[in-house]
Swiss-Prot record:
Record-linked InterPro entries: ATP-dep_Helicase_C, DinG/Rad3-like, Helic_SF1/SF2_ATP-bd_DinG/Rad3, Helicase-like_DEXD_c2, P-loop_NTPase, RAD3-like_helicase_DEAD, Rad3/Chl1-like
Annotated ATP binding sites: 39-46
Xref: Gene3D superfamilies: P-loop containing nucleotide triphosphate hydrolases
Name of the protein in question: ATP-dependent DNA helicase chl1
EC identifiers of the protein: 5.6.2.3
Species name: Aspergillus oryzae (strain ATCC 42149 / RIB 40) (Yellow koji mold)
Cofactor note: Binds 1 [4Fe-4S] cluster.
Motif DEAH box: chain residues: 249-252
Cofactor(s), names only, from the UniProt record: [4Fe-4S] cluster
Top-level taxon of origin: Eukaryota
Molecular-function annotations in GO: ATP binding; ATP hydrolysis activity; DNA binding; DNA helicase activity; iron-sulfur cluster binding; metal ion binding
Biological processes, Gene Ontology terms: establishment of sister chromatid cohesion; interstrand cross-link repair; mitotic G1 DNA damage checkpoint signaling; mitotic sister chromatid cohesion
Localization, UniProt: Nucleus
Primary role: ATP-dependent DNA helicase important for chromosome transmission and normal cell cycle progression in G(2)/M. May have a role in changing DNA topology to allow the loading of proteins involved in maintaining sister chromatid cohesion in the vicinity of the centromeres. Has a specific role in chromosome segregation during meiosis II.
Length: 721
């Protein structure tokens, strides 16, 4: 039976679109589907209320009809809510606090209670985090590197460690009462990650390890991407996905996140440091090491030497600044061909060689650092090991690249296809929900993340905006005031005629292009004495811009921008697609009356990484297609083109989504490039944007577009007075 609006216990009266979203979410989870949801407003409240109502119904069914099968284990169904950052997880926790669920105590049992309507039921919620977020031991938390923190923590737990060197906050039989106290306090009210850390500090128990005992008692668990998307992280937290519901918010960058989490980069300098540490360790303990251990350490030294020598050759030659690397070239050193990669991988995992070598190196460094008053450096070999493991077992989905940078050279293992890494989650979970404000274009999720999921289990949902249609105008500006066509391709980006300042927040394809624009604006105009385009704009709006260099923090830049806008003077904020201001920051009301997207921010097709990605997509499409070779080639090329365009348009849609944050907000969206008028490009925009572009055309003169914008804002001012 479809839930009614009041059954979701939304903190406010939900709009019709929000109610549709919550009902569809409820239905998908109940039926065990894999679904992608796009909802530009009210998404967070919809996710919290929709999942809570479902939990309560599951619990009611479970208590009324205990299940006989054990398909999903002994635990009740949980909601595992995942997002990219802890700030987004904190926002979700805030939404949970606002939902008031009625008591599930039957009325028969509540007779005689004075105010049954006042009975409410809380949700058992747990925020999970990494050691970096939750460690309360100052000897460990003071380290500024995630790997160093993890290694120091594990070192303190090793057998034989002196009592004074062990962590006093680690849960044990002696402090079991504190662990139970921690559990009860965590489950009493909804707490975010900072609350969890403070609670552990107040009680005197490690919140990272104590949280494990809370997981099985929780109904909703929130956690960041790395803790959900890595099997090793889930195992470390004793977190099972089997039979539970996985909800991933802000999922527009999920595929990139999976690839990045399972990709590793090392540098030549790190390899050289690890080689020195390995040889020093081998010489120091050569008489104590067993023959088998000496042999494996010698193999690691030969392998690291071979990789180091090949990178030095690339660095010292006049090869391109970046390019692909063949595994056979890295393993061409003397004696490397005799190494059994599977046995060496097992040895690296089981022997904990990296921890031993890094531990000895750190002990040696600490004595020198104390004398020189230096901070301990990062454990290097542990990082090298994380690269060697995938190198020893390369899959078809991964590829190696080198990148020269500032006298050093990086070696990068890049996961090209996230499907298999995510499949275990999809197969184990009861239901998987991907949600975001702007998830368009959605074809990538279907083709590259869920191609194996039956269509009967798969669903996509895109909801409109809560604003009335007259509160948005979206225009393609394909020509300048002089009639020059806007075509911000790589080949035409140096043309000075392409730049027309307009709007409040402008997003440029890259930092380099933004620098070019600022340089052109600051040139003296022909026939003008010491007057520049920059001066003319400054006469109307104060110009602020994002910078690659950290000369000013994002918070300071936004505060200055908001202060100028709040003072009544206009401001033009120049930003970069994919930069600090393009995600997670909302420009509502006067802060975002206009959003300009300058050009299409396609990734650099000439980069080795993107050439490899597109080649992989094309090869996969070719293998999966049928018909003649010519037809399969066409299918492959179309798949590569679509994948490339989708990456660009996901970034564009994220920028567009920064504006219009509530029902009474209004804004103009201007897409400055004639290519936005192509049906293939417009088809990848969110539906609520496309609806506003029905009468737009890149062939219209700039004056006509500017006239439309002027009428739009006049109408808005009139309606608000």
């Amino acid at each position: 039976m479809e839930p009614q609006a009041e059954e979701f216990h939304h903190p406010y009266s939900p709009y019709d679109i929000q109610l549709q979203f919550m009902r569809a979410l409820y239905s998908c989870i109940e039926k065990g589907k894999v679904a992608v949801f796009e909802s530009p407003t009210g998404k967070l409240a919809g996710l919290s209320t929709g999942t809570l109502e479902l939990l309560k119904r599951f619990q009611h069914k479970s208590s009324a009809h205990p299940r006989q099968d054990e398909d999903y284990g002994d635990e009740d169904i949980k909601i595992l809510y995942c997002s990219r950052t802890h700030s987004q997880l904190t926002q979700f926790a805030s939404e949970l606090r606002r939902v008031n669920m009625p008591s599930s105590i039957p009325k028969d049992f509540s007779e005689g209670v004075a105010d049954t309507d006042g009975l409410q039921e809380g949700v058992r919620h747990l925020s999970l985090g990494s050691r970096k977020n939750l460690c309360i031991n100052p000897r460990v938390s003071s380290l500024d590197n995630v790997t160093a923190i993890s290694e120091r923590c594990l070192d303190m737990q090793q057998p034989g460690v002196a009592a004074e060197q062990r962590c006093p906050f680690l849960p044990s039989n002696e402090n079991e009462a504190q662990v139970l106290q921690f559990r009860d306090h965590v489950l009493a009210t909804v707490k975010d990650i900072e609350d969890i850390g403070k609670l552990g500090k107040d009680i005197g128990i490690c919140p990272y390890y104590a949280s494990r005992s809370v997981t099985k008692h929780s109904e909703i668990v929130t956690l960041p991407y790395p803790l959900l998307l890595q099997r090793s992280a889930r195992d470390a937290l004793d977190l099972s996905i089997k039979g539970h519901v996985v909800v991933i918010d802000e999922a527009h960058n999920l595929m990139d996140a999976i690839s990045n989490i399972h990709s590793v980069t090392i540098t030549l300098s790190e390899l050289q440091t690890s080689l020195f540490q390995l040889t020093t360790y081998a010489r120091k303990f050569k008489t104590r090491l067993k023959g088998k251990n000496r042999n494996y350490i010698a193999q690691v030294i030969r392998l690291v030497t071979s990789i180091t020598d090949h990178l030095k050759t690339i660095l010292e030659t006049s090869q391109a600044p970046e390019g692909p690397v063949q595994p056979s070239d890295l393993m061409s050193g003397k004696g490397v061909d005799q190494i059994n990669p599977y046995k060496l991988c097992r040895y690296l995992r089981e022997s904990k060689l990296a921890r031993k070598v890094d531990g000895y190196s750190e002990f040696s460094r600490e004595r020198a650092d104390r004398q020189a008053d230096r901070k301990p450096s990062t454990p290097v070999l542990f990082h090298i090991q994380s690269f060697l493991l995938p190198l020893m077992n390369l899959s078809a989905e991964g590829k190696l690249f080198y990148i020269k940078a500032q006298g050093d050279i990086q070696l990068k293992y890049m996961l090209l296809d996230p499907m298999n890494q995510f499949r275990e989650i999809v197969d184990d979970a009861r239901a998987v929900i991907l949600a975001g404000g702007t998830m368009s274009p959605m074809t990538d999720y279907i083709h590259h993340l869920f191609p194996y999921v039956p269509s009967s289990r798969l669903g996509t949902f895109s909801y409109g905006h809560v604003i009335p249609p007259e509160n948005l105008i979206a225009q393609v500006l394909g020509k300048g005031v002089t009639g020059t066509e806007f075509d911000f391709t790589f080949e035409t980006r140096d043309s000075e005629r392409m730049v027309i300042p307009d709007g409040v927040v402008a997003f440029f394809p890259s930092y380099d292009y933004l620098s070019q624009v600022l340089s052109i604006w600051k040139r003296t105009l022909a026939g003008e004495k010491n007057r520049t385009v920059y001066d003319l704009i400054e006469g109307k709006k104060t110009i602020l811009h994002e910078s690659r260099d950290v000369t000013i923090s994002t918070e300071e830049l936004l505060q200055e921008y908001a202060s100028i806008v709040g003072s009544g003077r206009g401001a033009l904020l120049l930003s970069v697609v994919g930069g600090k201001l393009s995600e997670g920051i909302n420009f509502s009301d006067r802060l975002g009356r206009g959003v300009l997207i300058v050009g299409l921010p396609f990734p650099n097709i000439r980069s080795a990484v993107w050439q490899a990605k597109i080649h992989y997509v094309e090869q996969k499409a070719y293998k999966e297609s049928s018909g003649s070779d010519a037809n399969r080639q066409l299918v492959a090329k179309a798949a590569g083109k679509d994948f490339y365009e989708n990456s660009c348009m996901r970034a564009v849609n994220q920028c567009i989504g920064r504006a219009i944050r509530h029902r009474n907000d209004y804004a103009a969206i201007v897409l400055m490039d004639r290519r936005y008028d192509k049906p293939a490009i417009q088809g990848k925009l969110p539906a609520w944007i496309k609806q506003s572009m029905a009468s737009s055309s890149a062939l219209r003169p700039a004056g006509a577009t500017i006239g439309s914008l002027s009428k739009f804002f006049v109408a808005q001012r009139t309606s608000k007075t």
